[in-house]
Amino acid sequence: MKLWKKILVAVGGLLGVAALGGGGLVWMRVSAYDSSMSQVYAFALPKIERSTDPLVLARGKHLVESLGGCAANDCHGADLSGGKTISMGPVATITAPNITLGGLGAAYSDGELARLIQHGVKKDGRSLTFMPVHEINWLPDNDVQAIVSHIRTLSDSAKANGPMTVGLIGKMLDQSDALILDVARRIDHNHREVAPPPEPTKKYGRFIGKGCTGCHGATLSGGPIPGAPADMPIPSNITPDATGLAGWTFADFEKLLDQGVRKNGKKLDPFMPLESLVTMNEIERKALWDYLTSVPAKEFGNR
């Protein structure tokens, strides 16, 4: 799911959060957020070092552009020199930073970059803000190495990092679990589940599918997102139900990924992050398809 759009989803739930209580509740949640974000996590640095192997570098480039979603315009940008600033008023101002060798890529060691991907913590051991590490920290060490190695090949960009601030409302939404801003708090650091080697199976597809739940819900049946703005597009059902993918073929699914066109000929809303999906390779597409068609069929809206 595109990251800034998750903010739009969560902002819609603000009235519900406010209705839970008065100033005391606000203070408690803001204080809890600040305390959590100031925590220093003492994770050892993974023993991962960059590689110059062309195959490793190619794998890293692919992951950055596809499953990682890093190169999206609303993330780090096509050249990874930093994304556009998304201003959400009193909720937050978010800018994905420059991660080339002219930015954070030079400030972090290989191990620190690997730890960031696996545990969602910065160089100083404190939590990242907003980056969806919980959707990609299943990548095995060799894939993490590939990403780190690719970052080391990026051109030096002197582009300055944009603002990254979280307002009172954003802190409340995070503590209400309506929006993930405090990244490290959401990760099970002691039992990190790692994907098997890439293969066109539902077993591997389950990990890829983690990136779908933000919009389509835990059951993948779609439907209106609770508290979302009225003008936000409604996520589709992507389970094998009659209201979802029943009757679809793998060819239909590939057309959706490549052209953004549904089986019925209708185009997807731009809300769907097609710039990342279109770069998925055949193994990833088949794995995700096999997974989506294996999950329990749920009627549309049973999120």
Task: Indicate where each model-derived feature is located.
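N-terminal type II signal-anchor transmembrane helix
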Residues: 2-38
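Extended surface/linker regions that mediate inter-domain or inter-protein docking
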Residues: 13-16, 26, 30, 139-202, ...
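C-terminal capping alpha-helices of c-type cytochrome domains
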Residues: 21, 26, 109-122, 135-161, ...
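Electrostatic cytochrome c docking/interface patches
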Residues: 38-66, 177-209
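Gly/Gly-Pro-rich "capping" loops immediately C-terminal to redox-active cysteine motifs
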Residues: 43-44, 77-112, 127-140, 166, ...
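Interaction-mediating elements
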Residues: 52, 57, 67, 125, ...
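The canonical Cys-X-X-Cys-His
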Residues: 60, 67-79, 147, 205, ...
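Inter-heme linker and motif-flanking segments adjacent to c-type heme-binding CXXCH motifs
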Residues: 81-83, 123-128, 153-162, 195-200, ...
